[in-house]
Design a protein with these regions (language model features):
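N-terminal hydrophobic/helix-forming segments and targeting peptides
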Residues: 1-409
Length: 409
């Protein structure tokens, strides 16, 4: 990189600390209580009001019967324009009440958490309020437990040779006295009630880092909103952008699949977390791509991703000196980028990621520079598509004829 380019990058947004008001909004997004099946707290409670504060009156909003997914449409009704959907998912992996025992223990389902990472952490339980018909309430001050004490563990558990089984995990509500099960039921708890980690994000020790629960994937929803905020006043008029907050990703990409199946975008861009493989203990020996937190966002190649989109984004980033890292996808992207394939919709797809540490724990950590780089990269990609064909915009035929041929080398 020459001196001129180096000086330009030093002034780039992604090399600077995230503005406090932007960090505060990100914190608000990540704090939304939006467990799987209850995503409206984020999509309707946080994201929708934020969009309404800046989006032009001409934009439209798509809502859905079966989920709290929501789509903000830059050009409603303009089916002549090539449509580009950017999607983040609002659902958080959650625990659930499974059984209330006679001694007051509440046995819970740990979902996509590793049981040992949950023990001792504070959580919130959400349940119907028995005193207010149809209303929900939250219960705080609960912890997740397993053995009760190290004194009750087996020798193999103490050495680490034996782990903690998911069915050993329970919720500690500190009930005592007689009829402890009745005490728990009187709070309103019943099977299926969702439980979330109570761990808001905080600034990290190293510069421009932060940590906490549920970066997966409030970060994607935050990014979608920030991209829209950046482009709302520019009036891109040659592409139709569909800013999407989806649901049920963690249990099968069901929300995005339903939304894509209904709206049928021409291009699908998924934004989600990825792994910092370089820092993950023992992972380097598995020969994974050495993705690093703080070195730029990630772009997945493989699976059903469009090589044309990958190379176009890479070229845009190179031109604008935006840092990115290439990752590989095997048979499945593992994100909402699969939604079009799962829905049977003809869309060119790509996945954008943020390399984080400690995924699916209470201490997920990330770098604000990676987020800011991805936001600007996707915004630049949309501008590029808008300027395609001498300012006439990218067409569906462009996409249909974009497939890389290895026989023309």
């Amino acid at each position: 990189m020459n001196t001129t380019n180096e000086n330009a990058q030093k002034q780039s947004v992604w090399t600077q600390p995230m503005a406090q008001d932007q960090f505060d909004f990100m914190s608000t997004v990540l704090a939304a209580p939006s467990p799987i099946g209850f995503e409206a707290a984020m999509s309707y409670g946080v994201i929708k009001p934020e969009f309404e504060s800046f989006m032009p009156a001409s934009w439209g909003v798509h809502q859905f019967k079966g989920s709290a997914s929501i789509v903000f449409d830059s050009h409603p009704g303009r089916d002549d324009l090539t449509s580009i959907m950017i999607v983040g998912h609002a659902d958080k992996i959650r625990m659930q009440v499974r059984k209330i025992d006679e001694d007051g223990k509440v046995w819970i389902n740990t979902d996509s958490f590793l049981p040992t990472t949950l023990i001792g952490h504070e959580v919130k339980v959400f349940c119907l309020d028995p005193e207010k018909s149809g209303a929900y309430k939250s219960i705080t001050g609960c912890t997740v437990e397993a053995l009760g004490a190290i004194h009750f563990s087996t020798p193999a558990q103490r050495t680490g040779e034996q782990g903690i089984k998911p069915e050993s995990i329970y919720l500690e509500l500190h009930m005592h006295g007689e009829d402890r099960k009745a005490q728990v039921e009187a709070l309103g708890l019943r099977a299926g009630d969702p439980i979330l980690l109570d761990r808001p994000i905080k600034r990290g020790v190293a510069a421009d880092t932060f940590y906490g629960a549920y970066l997966d994937n409030g970060l994607g929803c935050f990014s979608v909103t920030e991209i829209a905020r950046m482009l709302a006043s520019e009036g891109l008029d040659k592409v139709r952008v569909l800013y999407t907050i989806a649901t049920h990703e963690e249990i099968g990409r069901f929300g995005s699949t339903q939304v894509v199946g209904e709206i049928k975008p021409d291009v699908l861009i998924a934004t989600d977390v990825n792994h910092d493989y370089e820092a993950a203990p023992g992972i380097g020996s598995r020969n994974m791509t050495p993705l690093k937190m703080g070195e730029g966002f990630t772009v997945g190649r493989g699976s059903v991703s469009s090589e044309f989109l990958v190379q176009t984004l890479a070229n845009v980033c190179s031109e604008k000196e935006i840092p990115y890292q290439i990752d590989f996808s095997g048979r499945d992207m593992g994100t909402d980028g699969m939604a079009a394939a799962l829905a049977g919709v003809d869309s060119a797809a790509i996945t954008i990621g943020y390399p984080i540490r400690n995924m699916h724990t209470s201490s997920e950590s990330a770098h604000t520079g990676d987020l800011l780089a991805s936001i600007h990269a996707i915004a630049e990609l949309l501008r590029h598509f808008n300027d395609f064909n001498n300012g006439n915009g990218i067409t569906r035929d462009d996409l249909k004829n974009s497939h890389i041929r290895l026989d023309n080398l």
